[in-house]
Amino acid sequence: MKRPAIIVPEDLGGKVLLHACCAPCSSAIVEWLVQHDIRPTIFYYNPNIFPFEEYEIRKNESKRHAESLGLSWIDGDYNHEQWRQDVCGLEGEPERGRRCEQCFTLRLTVAARKAKELGIKYFTTTLASSRWKSLEQIERAGHIAEQMVNGQCSMGNGVVFWAQNWRKGGLYERRNQLLKEFDFYNQQYCGCEFSKR
């Protein structure tokens, strides 16, 4: 029997905190979640994006998308200088290198904290929809974030990272259709100044 492309955790409970990197990457995931009676709270936390004007464009597109669907959208704030300190020494790493994994871990840890604060058990990320990103790095980062927020002894009561390949099930193709339908701004680089090389 063929395994379904999207595996929904049995105890999801109809809600998830979705860390969103941008509107284009979020669009098909959000559509799929809503169609399957899962209400995402969209959490926009991307201090890696540079310059600030680029960050504002992407943030506003993400917010516009969520508002058009009547979904909760949370601004995770922007502190690029702190992000630079957190990836210090990794500036020369290639895309999909150690800098990216550190960046994912930082962002997903903040997302996990937000999920815990809101009482949402599961969190996931749109980063896993990009063909330019390593799914293995994203999954590791999500599980590290889960452990950092829960501590060693969560006894099953903590937040859980929903590791999902959001490229599957036709979602990547649907993303490209929704990009045109919503007339989203579509960036040409991941976000940080080092990814522009």
Locations of the language-model features?
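Nucleotide-activated chemistry modules centered on ATP-dependent adenylation/adenylyltransferase
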Residues: 1-197
